[in-house]
Amino acid sequence: MKISFIEPAILLNAFAMTLTIPLTAQYVYRRIWEETGNYTFASNSNGSECDQNKSSSIFAFREEVQKKASLFNLQVEMSALIPGLVSTFMLLASSDNHGRKLPMVLSSLGSLGTNTWLCMMSYFDLPLQLLIASTFIGALFGNYTTFWGACFAYIVDQQKEYKHRIIRIAILDFMLGVVTGLTGLSSGYFIRELGFVWSYFITAMVLIVNLAYILFFLNDPIKESSSQIVTMSCIESLKDLFYRTYMLFKNGSSKRQALLCLLIFTLVIYFFVIIGISPIFTLYELGPPLCWNEVYIGYGSALGSVSFLSSFLGIWLFSYCLKDIHIAYIGIFTTMVGMTLAAFTRTTLMMFLVRIPFIFTIMPLSVLRSMLSKVVHSTEQGALFACIAFLETLAGVTSTSAYSGIYSATVAWYPGFIFLLSAGLLVLPAISLCCVKSIGWEEGSYTLLVHEEPSEHTSD
């Protein structure tokens, strides 16, 4: 008997993702450190020692390693750009007809393959450049954005009422906060006690369990239409995907089109900043003046993951007295404050305290997705989230690539510049939300926008 709870799959995937990201960042950093010079990599939790060596050769060596690590991350992200965009769009858009499980399974297979390859690389000490090839192949199956987009569409399929949907999403954010927080907190101990090989092996095992759950236990609310599958060729199916995405923006009133474009722009730009700055935090903490070890990196990652929990509480509390758009404003402005403070942080204590303004970072992502889901028909949810996931994949890859390039160019003269740039970029989604407000977004008006649409978008 199959069940309809997507939460276990999301939490297992979140564990694997939260553990893999800091593992890979530190693995790449250490490999480049070892290949760049003759200095022995030592884990130091004392930032003052890092400060005292600013005039020595080790300080220049650290900066060189930071530059090389940033540029290598740029190459890795660029290798996943094209295959990630194509696979994400096709898998999620086709999920309206073929079910939500297909993109979940394929993206999990891609993650499993990448983690298995990282395990082999760390065990056999294979050339680091092979990571670029494995990332390219893994992106052909989708990525984390593909998985999350399919999961969100799955929840929308099940929860037809908006209030039930937002409660379930908020509870899921709470659970994600607990899982990612504990995983981030323990990631440093995984590296210290088990090493990279066993850490990647554990991640691969978790992904295998997740695949088994999705394949054998998870029910799919979208039933496949066998007649459509038989009569449509691959080319026709691809044309249908583009057609339904085109109709997503064409159908409805001009107000609905404007709201849809503005909300997507707001979500994508905010996502661009949040995803782009995430790996920079790790590089910034590894280098001077902080020089954190793997345990401190884990603490920082755990504090960053607390935003899932605090965002859940924020949505739950603010929803009683504020509208969705105002909740999104709070998340954007508090994140902007956090970015500005991070630019001037030079001590370990301050770096931990800087995480406080980031407590509502996830709120805009959850709220904006919910606002978007209210603007379109239930039959367009797959096309909508395929479009969002496509743009998020594009934004995610370009942001990490751009941020890595900018950080490598500015780390020598001012490492905190990238945080000030992020704070400035967050002005754009704030302005976009002002435009949404001026157009006339009101709570409850989204229902009218949906009913305004004709039913031309459905496939014959």
Curated annotation (Swiss-Prot):
Transmembrane segments: 74-94, 112-132, 136-156, 171-191, 196-216, 258-278, 302-322, 325-345, 348-368, 382-402, 411-431
Top-level taxon: Eukaryota
Bilayer topology: Multi-pass membrane protein
Signal sequence, renumbered to the chain: 1-25
Cited function: Lysosomal proton-coupled steroid conjugate and bile acid transporter. Preferentially recognizes lipophilic steroid conjugates or bile acis as endogenous substrates and seems to mediate escape from lysosomes to the cytoplasm. Modulates hepatic cytosolic copper homeostasis, maybe acting as a lysosomal copper transporter and sequestering copper ions in the lysosome. Delivers pathogen-associated molecular patterns to cytosolic pattern recognition receptors as part of the innate immune response to microbes.
Localization, UniProt: Lysosome membrane
GO MF annotation terms: copper ion transmembrane transporter activity; symporter activity
Topological domain ranges for the Extracellular compartment: 26-73, 133-135, 192-195, 279-301, 346-347, 403-410
Pfam families, per database record: MFS_1 (PF07690)
Family: Belongs to the major facilitator superfamily. SLC46A family.
Disruption-associated phenotype: Knockout mice have liver copper levels increased by around 30%, with no differences in iron contents. Mutants are resistant to TCDD and high-fat diet-induced hepatic triglyceride accumlation and after 3 of high-fat diet feeding, body weight changes, liver mass and epididymal fat mass are reduced compared to wild-type mice.
Cytoplasmic side: 95-111, 157-170, 217-257, 323-324, 369-381, 432-460
Tissues showing expression: Expressed in liver, kidney, small intestine and colon.
Residues spanned by motif Tyrosine-based lysosomal-sorting motif: 446-449
Glycosylated residues (UniProt): 38, 46, 53
The organism of origin for this protein: Mus musculus
Annotated catalysed reactions: estrone 3-sulfate(out) + n H(+)(out) = estrone 3-sulfate(in) + n H(+)(in); 25-hydroxyvitamin D3 sulfate(out) + n H(+)(out) = 25-hydroxyvitamin D3 sulfate(in) + n H(+)(in); cholate(out) + n H(+)(out) = cholate(in) + n H(+)(in); glycocholate(out) + n H(+)(out) = glycocholate(in) + n H(+)(in)
Coiled coil: none
Induction: In liver, expression is induced by the environmental contaminant 2,3,7,8-tetrachlorodibenzo-p-dioxin (TCDD); the induction is mediated by AHR.
This protein's GO CC annotations: lysosomal membrane
One GO BP annotation of this record: vacuolar transmembrane transport
Protein name: Lysosomal proton-coupled steroid conjugate and bile acid symporter SLC46A3
Listed InterPro entries: MFS, MFS_trans_sf
UniProt entry keywords in alphabetical sequence: Glycoprotein, Lysosome, Membrane, Signal, Symport, Transmembrane, Transmembrane helix, Transport
